[in-house]
UniProtKB/Swiss-Prot annotation:
Superkingdom as given in the UniProt entry: Bacteria
Binding residues annotated for UDP-N-acetyl-alpha-D-glucosamine, in chain numbering: R95, K164, V165, S166, V167, D308, I330
Reactions the enzyme catalyzes: phosphoenolpyruvate + UDP-N-acetyl-alpha-D-glucosamine = UDP-N-acetyl-3-O-(1-carboxyvinyl)-alpha-D-glucosamine + phosphate
Keyword rRNA processing included in the entry's annotation: no
Gene3D superfamilies listed in its UniProt record: Enolpyruvate transferase domain
Higher taxonomy: Bacteria, Pseudomonadati, Pseudomonadota, Alphaproteobacteria, Rickettsiales
GO cellular component, one term: cytoplasm
Gene symbol of the encoding locus: murA
Name the record gives this protein: UDP-N-acetylglucosamine 1-carboxyvinyltransferase
Molecular function, one GO term: UDP-N-acetylglucosamine 1-carboxyvinyltransferase activity
2-(S-cysteinyl)pyruvic acid O-phosphothioketal carried by residues: C119
Pathway participation: Cell wall biogenesis; peptidoglycan biosynthesis
Gene Ontology process terms (BP): cell division; cell wall organization; peptidoglycan biosynthetic process; regulation of cell shape; UDP-N-acetylgalactosamine biosynthetic process
Length: 419
């Protein structure tokens, strides 16, 4: 099994190009079921993308892959969908597999999807996915670990209020609603840029969607959608991760290929800590200027601070001058990186969904183990900050969400290699 060897203590200097957004490309790939052909560009080279390709192929899709140096192009032909079951062996690898449920059900009137897997960071139940599809007229039962869904005729437009903001359920609802009979109005929706990107792709395919980027989305169902081409937006979570990497190594890095407005909340939080962050053409520049203040943080649905960046921010706060309180409001059990950071000398105490982080002068290298995707990269940031050697085990999590991570960091001066 591979591991990463990190010799820290080197300030990152240079530029990093941001890849396509994992959390946008996966639902867009699922949306290909709604039409006959979808051409997607700026696709990141990630194992989760490979898992979604395998899933779509299992349903009968034909996928042409055009490989470029920094991205894939995918041409997905879904004219011959002939299997409506998403098997456990594929779905267990990735929670995003549940996003084929809405498209299969709304287009073909039936779907059988295994209850999903993915990162071990809490229950993340599918209740809201099921509730909104039932509101559209679907019959759904959970049997033997599978969601069995069917409808008599087309799904019907509905008004539905999500009990809590759910990115995943918002996506499945939108994917189903675009082919319903009538109008659907969704309240308390997720507002994430990746949801906006999915909606923009669906509009390119001929969908009628209003209220994009707000908590109230109105969708007028169509009889069918068109073939289309679409470029996926850049990954704000990857961008934020490298912004924190520049800060924790006392570096100076240009993050390129990202719109500033979708990372502005990250930039503002960094500025609070004393890090210099300025917009540049097609990106943002992050510069350490000699101080790192303790700052409290709460994760919240967008435009709040992303839960997917909480672990990385915590790594930064372990070296701050003071005490910070980090509150995780999205997922339970998302502090699994804390014991590993403490092995490196961090002073962190967890109380429920809150972590009290007391800054220390320096972390020390250690052998550590990744528990999930975002936790693994937080340990890399911690390792980069030390003046010693860190060995990170179970790095397969990284390849689910970060393209060419070692290469991008090495090009900015990091001493990091996979063995």
């Amino acid at each position: 099994m591979h591991k990463l060897i990190i010799h820290g203590g080197k300030p990152l200097k240079g530029s990093i190009n941001i890849s396509g957004a994992k959390n946008a490309v996966l639902p867009i790939m699922a949306a290909s079921i709604l039409t006959d052909k979808l051409h997607i560009t700026n696709v990141p080279k990630l194992t989760d993308v490979g898992t979604m390709k395998d899933l779509l192929r299992s349903h009968g899709a034909d996928i042409e892959i055009i490989e470029h140096q920094d991205e894939f192009e995918l041409i997905i032909n879904t004219e011959n969908i002939n299997n409506f079951t998403a098997d456990y062996e594929i779905v267990r690898k990735m929670r995003a597999s549940i996003w084929v449920l809405g498209p299969l059900l709304t287009k073909y009137g039936k779907a059988k999807v295994s209850l999903p897997g993915g990162c071990a960071i809490g229950a993340r139940q599918v209740d809201l996915h099921i509730a909104v599809l039932k509101a559209m007229g679907a019959t759904i039962e959970i049997e033997d670990g599978y969601i069995n869904a069917s409808s008599k005729g087309r799904l019907k437009g509905t008004h539905f209020v999500f009990d809590k903001v759910s990115v995943g359920a918002t996506i499945n609802a939108i994917l189903a609603a675009v082919l319903t009979e009538g109008e659907t109005v969704l309240f308390n929706c997720g507002r994430e840029p990746e949801i906006v990107d999915l909606c923009n792709c669906l509009i390119t395919m001929g969908a009628d969607i209003a209220g994009i980027g707000t908590s109230e989305i109105t969708i007028k169902g169509k009889d069918s959608l068109n073939k289309a081409s679409y470029k996926v937006l850049s990954d704000r979570i990857e961008a934020g991760t490298y912004m924190f990497a520049a800060a924790i190594t006392k570096g100076d890095v240009k993050i390129c290929g990202i719109d500033y407005h979708i990372v502005e909340n990250i930039a503002l939080k960094l500025i609070e800590t004393g890090i210099k962050v300025v917009p540049i053409n097609n990106g943002v520049q992050v510069t350490y200027e000699g101080k790192l203040n303790s700052v409290d943080l709460e994760t919240n649905p967008y435009p709040g601070f992303a839960t997917d960046l909480q672990a990385q921010f915590m790594s930064l706060m372990t070296l701050s001058s003071g005490v910070s309180m980090i509150t995780e409001n999205i997922f339970e059990n998302r502090f699994m990186h804390v014991p590993e950071l403490c092995r490196m000398g961090a002073d962190i105490v967890v109380r429920g969904n809150k972590a009290v982080v007391r800054g220390v002068e320096m972390l020390k290298g250690a052998e550590v183990m990744a528990s999930d995707l975002r936790a693994s990269v937080s340990l890399i940031l911690a390792g980069l900050s030390t003046n010693s050697k860190t060995v990170l085990h179970r790095i397969y999590h990284l390849d689910r969400g970060f393209q060419d991570l070692e290469k991008k960091l090495s090009n900015c001066g990091a001493d990091i290699k996979r063995v």
